[in-house]
Amino acid sequence: MRFDASQPLPEAYRGAIIALGNFDGFHLGHQAVARAAVDWARAEGRPAIIATFDPHPVRYFKPDALPFRLTTLDQREELFAQAGADAMLVFAFDDALASTTATEFVHDLLVARLGAAGVVTGEDFTFGKARGGNVGVLADLGATENLRVRAIGPVLLGGEVVSSSLIRDALSSEIIVPSNPANTFLESAG
């Protein structure tokens, strides 16, 4: 199930725990955030939603940058479902979202429009106009809105933080990892 974040969620999905991030590539770090959100939602009998941005904010701010998308929305929707999410939520990254302050993002979107009960992000998550919000700001704003916030630390592989940038760099360098021909950075959600 896919929802557009510009619209209110159906009543059955309000009160969800939302994993929030770009989730391009859905690597081990992304999976840790998703798993925490799904586990939290299941423990409380709530829907689990994984939210993503399209286009990627970098693509919005630098439209002429080389292609770097690791997964399409359709692929992410399938991966999110395999991870246990009840739905995928897509924030259209456009002029309106780019000009939304951190406070507006939390109050107007996460709380008022989507009715989120909790949000899980990575520790490095930033949001809002000019990246005005981070996990600390999200937690502070959430506390005033009865929105609970959890942050998940980085996942290390071979001593390096697993990230979409690391994967893109490996792909652009044509690095092959013979010990794991399937994909060093991805893990089956099943």
Q: What would you call each of these model-derived segments?
A:
Residues 1-190:
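Nucleotidyltransferase catalytic core that binds NTPs
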